[in-house]
Amino acid sequence: MFGSLLLGIATLLGAIYAFLVSNFGHWRRRGVTEPRALPLFGSFPNMIWPRQHFTMDMRDIYMHYRNTHSYVGCYLLRAPKLLVLEPRLVYEIYVSAFSHFENNDASKMVDIAKDRLVALNPFVLEGEEWRHQRAVFSTLLTNGRIRTTHAIMQRVCLDLCQFIAIKSAGGKDLDCIDLGLRFTGESLFDCVLGIQARTFTDNPLPVVRQNHEMSAENRGLAIAGAVHGLFPNLPRWLRPKVFPRSHDRFYGQMISEALRLRRSKHQERNDFINHLLEMQRELDLSEEDMASHAMTFMFDGLDTTSNSIAHCLLLLGRNPDCQRRLYEELQLVNPGGYLPDLDALIDLPYLSACFNESLRIYPAGGWASKTCTKEYELRGSHHSEPLKLRPGDHVMVPIYALHNDPDLYPEPDVFRPERFLDGGLKNCKQQGIFLGFGNGPRQCVGMRLGLAMAKAALAAIVQRFEVVVSPRTLNGTELDPLIFVGVHKGGIWLQFVPRKNVTTK
């Protein structure tokens, strides 16, 4: 009896082991070098056992092979992924050969029947549906419509600075991840929904808490990633729900209320929600479709923009000379601490350079994963024969590793905005070494709105306060291994010293 039990356990363990390693060798059989992969953990063990952020696993592989290989075969748990190391090939995948890699792997993780609020988000859509929804959002995000949000951003920036002045009085530390979420939450709710979220008051809508649950505490996202890694070909209807139901209820109710109020008041504002109502009449959209369209702005802008603001403030606080130069640029455009008009703000070269350099050091997404949609020959400089990629093959781009490669960016840990002045941004994007917002036709759909918000917040803060790093903030640029989206480990705690002769009112 005991022997039979042991045999059964051994058989079960053997079957599990065989399942976990069954895909290993997929790339080797196609002539591609494979770094060591472990059962269950795959090539990126810190995704399961997070001693450091798992993008560091990609960076380690990248640094080991970049001078001898253009790509290597890796495994996300047990899902085969081709890790592309050569920047020229990265540019091909994103831009020149885009038609062969037009789908994001995120579409394989999300069941849009379960997560209806992201059902129309271009990031998770494929093929013709992606093209259609991308066109819809292009009409929503015109320069003219973004300009109409500037008055709202001016009001929110004033509230932001008053909040900072009160909460940081006496040299108190401020949690800048929280501060960024308050700003983006207030901005997006008013710009998109016409609702003031009151995030800088003592009685706010629970925007910050809901977003924290969606990102930092979202077990559904981690589970969906693990399921995709273990069962890469799982049918869509078996995929788990990604976003918390509390998140669906909160945003669903807010969006429905915003639509109801706008209809009842018959307001004519040239803003996003007014255009959504026009689209509903023209395209016969359901309330669920309307909510999904509105939620795309929230999903794409809340977390990534707030983190980018916080990281840029951290780096400016660590580099007083850069902060001083940015302050002088802002004063030349609009002395007195008032926010410049949107066109002037967007075009400020040093502000743009500071923001892009912070995105280089702390990219909003540390990696990207694309799906081959048409057969393609990948011709790497380090390989004599091209690799034939087939539809369904997945390629990964190690964005964090590219951004922090000392051969591409000398002294990558040093905050040096000058890298992105005088055509530096265009040059880096064309080389395939800067992917702060992605690149090519599938670059971030909300990029212009996100840039407008981030630059408005940074300009307002730097003109009114000197930013100083608190001793509570850890040195270095290590990412928190427990948060899926890359955030500075230990939080970002800063102090804000009011500048002389500048009002915060």
Curated annotation (Swiss-Prot):
Disulphide bond pairs: none
Role noted for this protein: May be involved in the metabolism of insect hormones and in the breakdown of synthetic insecticides.
InterPro entries: Cyt_P450 (IPR001128), Cyt_P450_CS (IPR017972), Cyt_P450_E_grp-I (IPR002401), Cyt_P450_sf (IPR036396), Insect_CytP450_Detox (IPR050476)
Record-given protein name: Probable cytochrome P450 28c1
Cofactor: heme
EC number in record: 1.14.-.-
This protein's record includes keyword Heme: yes
Superkingdom of this protein's organism: Eukaryota
Family, as annotated: Belongs to the cytochrome P450 family.
Gene from which the chain derives: Cyp28c1
Cross-referenced Pfam families: p450
